[in-house]
Amino acid sequence: MTVREPLRPVLYDDARDLVRLLDQKALPAEERWLELSTADAVAAAIRDLTVRGAPAIGVAAAYALAVEARRGAGPERLRAAADLLARARPTAVNLAWAVRRMSARLGAPAADVLAEAHAIRDEDEAACRRIGALGAPLVPARARVLTHCNAGALATAGYGTALGVVRAAVESGNAISVFADETRPFLQGARLTAWELHRDGIPVTLLTDGMAGWLMARGEIGCVVVGADRIAANGDVANKIGTYALAVLAAHHRLPFYVAAPWSTVDLATPTGADIPIEERGADEVVMLAGQRIAPAGVPARYPAFDVTPAALVTAIVTERGVVRAPHAAGLATLASAR
């Protein structure tokens, strides 16, 4: 089956030195693009989830620094911009990785800085396509695949990680379909994953977040495929809040639980998931929906944006360098030493 060419949510306008971001807060109602000309504006867009997904925000940050360099920012301004971008979201390691990589080039001519940002983008899309190729054979024939949040083209430079596996499986002729859970409170599954898959002609059915266990018990789910925001050296995985619960359910029902992520998401300097900083977002994102309050005034709410899935619950981690199974720590170390 031929699948529609995926969107690329982060673009660079060379003629005008602008970062163009697909406003993911406006989806699915409107396909709206924002044009940003400063690192401050891009950092704000990362913080408020205009652009989201660990690889995508890394690409956005790289282009933000390229904009600053091309517009003549001096060393002090570039250092401040890099620091601001790196701190925009603490859990997603791709962001800090991209900023570190760009920072090493900030003393070079502006054209070289932009070339490095383009390289980060191109490498991420190539990694996603390789992840898809390695992950597709893991998906059972004609399976209904459960995914969480959005780890598709919208979350990357293009093609996707978890949805890259789905996309590659479909392109190979495997007649699979997808269950996308809505992913409260930002509704990435409902607004983004369902929109992206429907746009690309891949069968998708939307679920509420509490349905997965029952559908697993009924034999309606063949495997779970998710992305990641950070993978610790021991194989623990930080991903969108709710991922851990799905991993527990999958283990109980003896279903494969796969994590798809580029190597830039692997953080060998972080020993375990307990060492990963978890971003806490504002309570308003939980108690408000589409501008309307959905909980009584005065009732507090919590929103840890991510949780950590222990490596013991992960069947395999799929990166562009290879597929890692238990023991995950040894497998990740082997892939690291092979390059």
From Swiss-Prot:
GO terms for biological process: L-methionine salvage from methylthioadenosine. It is an enzyme of class 5 (isomerase). It comes from the Bacteria. SUPFAM superfamilies: NagB/RpiA/CoA transferase-like. Its EC number is 5.3.1.23. It catalyses: 5-(methylsulfanyl)-alpha-D-ribose 1-phosphate = 5-(methylsulfanyl)-D-ribulose 1-phosphate. Belongs to the eIF-2B alpha/beta/delta subunits family. MtnA subfamily. This is Methylthioribose-1-phosphate isomerase.
